[in-house]
Structure formats: C-alpha cells, structure tokens
Amino acid sequence: MDIEKAASRREEEEPIVQRPKLDKGKGKAHVFAPPMNYNRIMDKHKQEKVSAAGWKRGVAIFDFVLRLIAAITAMAAAAKMATTEETLPFFTQFLQFQAEYTDLPTMSSFVIVNSIVGGYLTLSLPFSIVCILRPLAVPPRLFLIICDTAMMGLTMMAASASAAIVYLAHNGNSSSNWLPVCQQFGDFCQGTSGAVVASFIAATLLMFLVILSAFALKRST
C-alpha cells in the first residue's frame, strides 16, 4: 500500500507534458508564410533600384557629353599642331627659315598621342550609350574607367612635354644659350600654344570622366 501511495504521489508531482500530434500523411511539407512586411521591403528595394537607375542615367548622359567634347578637343589639338607652320624669308626667297612640328620629336609625339586619344574617345561613345541604356551595368563602366585613366596619363604626358618646348620657344634659356624664337616665328608659337592648351583641356575632361565613373561604380557596390 505504501508503494502504491508513493507511486501515485510521484505521478501527481510530475508536470503534464503534451506531446504534439504528428501528421501521419506522407509527402506533406509545411508552408511558411512570409512576414507581414515582406511586400513592403520588396517595394522599398524596387524604389531604391529605380532611383539609383535614374541618377546613374543622368551621370551617364553627362559622361557622354563630356566624352564628346573631349574627343573634339583632342582632335582639334592634334590638327592644330599638325597644320601649324611658318616660313621666314632670309635675304632672298631661295634661302628661307621654316618652322613646323616635324622639326621637334616632342611635337610629333604630341600629334600622335592626341590623335590616338581622340580616336579612342570617339570609339568609346557607344559604351557610354550602353551606360545610358543600362545604367546599373558595371562591366562597361569598369572598362571605360580603366581606358580613360590610361588615356588621361598619355594626354597629360604629351601636353606637359610640349608645354616645356613651347616655354623654351617663348622665353629661351640663358644658361644653355637658347634664344627665344617666338619673336621671329610668332604665328608658329601661337599655333603650338593653342594646341597645347587644347590638349590640357582634353586631359582635364578625361580626369572628370574618371571621377564620374569611379563615383558611379562606388555607389553600385
């Protein structure tokens, strides 16, 4: 009797645990409903993508305009340098002094580099159009920023070297006994100076293009 009473007391003291009923059906999967704010989150994400595409399209349009201006400027610099020449008669018409860009290797390199840069900028316009049509696309923007950086370095190098030659032509160098020649070849020096200024403008525009592409890529990540 004591054993039966002790067993009954233990049963009364133990907590009652309800076991869950298992579904005996086979192949049934429980479907979890999405949270209540799921649609709201998706709508917010779509709105963010639309807004990002909007301002990136504006950046791409500005990129296209700057790229077109830079192409025209680089080609104008190359054409101006290539067509600048001046001839001075000395005593007779049979003995003349002539100045042209082929007399200086630096000027010849200037024409070649700016021609290459102008051609590249022209060929890169379709990629800029792709960025306008697909503002969220990363590969064309990445391609443009790499090539723009290389072309900016080439343009700056050619413009800086030619600027040094133009400076010597205007002012000379007393230490090296180099006399200024722009007093005699004024038109030639004006033409070369204008070409160098145009090349620096093209390099500056390329720098802005690199900054725009970097800004667009940063906001994409």
Swiss-Prot record:
Glycans are attached at residue 173. Keywords: Cell membrane, Cell wall biogenesis/degradation, Glycoprotein, Membrane, Transmembrane, Transmembrane helix. The keyword Cell wall biogenesis/degradation applies. The chain crosses the membrane at residues 59-79, 110-130, 149-169, 195-215. Residues 1-28 are annotated as: Disordered. InterPro entries: CASP/CASPL, CASP_dom, CASPL. Residues 1-58, 131-148, 216-221 are cytoplasmic. It is found in: Cell membrane. One of its GO terms (biological process) is cell wall modification. GO terms for cellular component: Casparian strip; plasma membrane. Residues 80-109, 170-194 are extracellular. GO terms for molecular function: protein homodimerization activity. It is a multi-pass membrane protein. Residues 1-12 have a biased composition (Basic and acidic residues). Regulates membrane-cell wall junctions and localized cell wall deposition. Required for establishment of the Casparian strip membrane domain (CSD) and the subsequent formation of Casparian strips, a cell wall modification of the root endodermis that determines an apoplastic barrier between the intraorganismal apoplasm and the extraorganismal apoplasm and prevents lateral diffusion. Belongs to the Casparian strip membrane proteins (CASP) family. Homodimer and heterodimers. This is Casparian strip membrane protein 3. It comes from Arabidopsis lyrata subsp. lyrata.
